[in-house]
Amino acid sequence: DGGIGSVPFPLVADLTRGISLAYGVLSEEGESYYPQGVAMRATFIVDTKGIVRHQLVNDEPLGRNIDEVIRVLDALQFFEENGQVCPAGWTSGQTGMSNTPSGVASYLSEHAEKL
């Protein structure tokens, strides 16, 4: 039959550039290495509630890093499953921390030698 199978979100084309404009990825003259009116490369990570939790917009000379996108996805999934936030430099398999003053203090004291 072809196609990509069942996906839980719509696939769209942006023929009028309205989506690119709404998401702020449409290049403007003098603000980007892209020609005016071209959509810059962008990644938006949306949580299970439909909230954009991370966005990354790359101008033409900057390459994307799929490993960082995967790390951010892992961090979001970790938060959704455990309710703990992921500190700077966090990678999958590491501990998170409570986003309270005492939780941050506890995490920092436990990991002081590594920081």
Question: How would you describe each model-predicted region?
Answer:
Residues 1-115:
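Chalcogenol-based redox active-site neighborhoods
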